């Protein structure tokens, strides 16, 4: 889990727009966040396997 202080810091509006960065909305992880879902790769995978993301399915070919 991410530190609560850093999650709160990222939630606020920065003084300069380039300082803004994405965090996972579920766990607060700052890296590997998919903008479309607002989730990190780990939470995205867990939720997709559990069927909690509509329209997302495991690919097979």
From Swiss-Prot:
| Residues that coordinate or bind Zn(2+) | 24, 27, 40, 43
Q: Which family does it belong to?
A: Belongs to the universal ribosomal protein uS14 family. Zinc-binding uS14 subfamily.
Q: Which GO terms describe its molecular function?
A: rRNA binding; structural constituent of ribosome; zinc ion binding
Protein keywords: Metal-binding, Ribonucleoprotein, Ribosomal protein, RNA-binding, rRNA-binding, Zinc
Q: What does this protein do?
A: Binds 16S rRNA, required for the assembly of 30S particles and may also be responsible for determining the conformation of the 16S rRNA at the A site.
Task: Specify the species.
Answer: Mycobacterium tuberculosis (strain ATCC 25618 / H37Rv)
Single GO cellular component annotation? small ribosomal subunit
Name by which UniProt lists this protein: Small ribosomal subunit protein uS14B
**PANTHER family in alphabetical order:** 30S RIBOSOMAL PROTEIN S14 (PTHR19836), SMALL RIBOSOMAL SUBUNIT PROTEIN US14M (PTHR19836:SF19)
Gene3D superfamilies membership: 30s Ribosomal Protein S14, Chain N (4.10.830.10)
CC cofactor note = Binds 1 zinc ion per subunit.
Question: One Pfam family name from the record?
Answer: Ribosomal_S14
Kindly state the subunit structure of this protein. Part of the 30S ribosomal subunit. Contacts proteins S3 and S10.
InterPro entries, alphabetically? Ribosomal_uS14, Ribosomal_uS14_bact, Ribosomal_uS14_CS, Ribosomal_uS14_sf
Q: Which GO terms describe its biological process?
A: translation
């Amino acid at each position: 889990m991410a530190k609560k202080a850093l999650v709160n810091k990222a939630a606020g509006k920065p003084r300069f727009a380039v300082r803004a960065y994405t965090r996972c909305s579920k766990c607060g992880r700052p890296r590997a966040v998919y903008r479309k879902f607002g989730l990190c790769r780990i939470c995205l995978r867990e939720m997709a396997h559990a069927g909690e993301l509509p329209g997302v399915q495991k690919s097979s070919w």
